[in-house]
Amino acid sequence: NSIAPGFPAIFGTWPFVSDLRTGAMSGGSGEQALLSAGCAQMHRFYNLPGGAAAGIADAKLPDMQAGWEQATSNVMAGLSGLNMVYEAAGMHASLLGFCLESLILGNDLIGQALRCVRGIEVTEDTVSLDVIRATCLDGPGHYLGSEQTLNLMQTEYLSLIHI
């Protein structure tokens, strides 16, 4: 695209971090998430769509460590504006293992990451000073019965997967 503008191209980056103590790959590290975010910045600089790895866990099993590592890097990838994410779900042991159950967990995790990327919409309707006034000053003191709350539950709250 830099040579011939308009020519379709995807900037495929694949940075990996090594544990400096052992030399082993550390796909679930915070540094890996930072490198993927840095790749997104390069993609924007060159005005090309691109991808990088995120969602990899160093953990060998779908446990808390795996969830933490996968969530951190997937949210970082989303917030940095990465166009494509390789290995976004299911990958363990720094790409040496794969877990089908982690695909299910990853689906929920990626949904939460995408919700973070969407951000908070601030408009006259979403600030809802009239609803705040009616609830806090004249009403029950909570929003659980509010029509607006019931409507927003469908778009603003992502529930856990029910299996």
Language model features by range: what are they?
Residues 101-161:
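Catalytic-core signal marking the mid-to-C-terminal active-site face
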Residues 1-109:
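Glycine-rich anion/phosphate-binding loop at the beta-strand->alpha-helix junction
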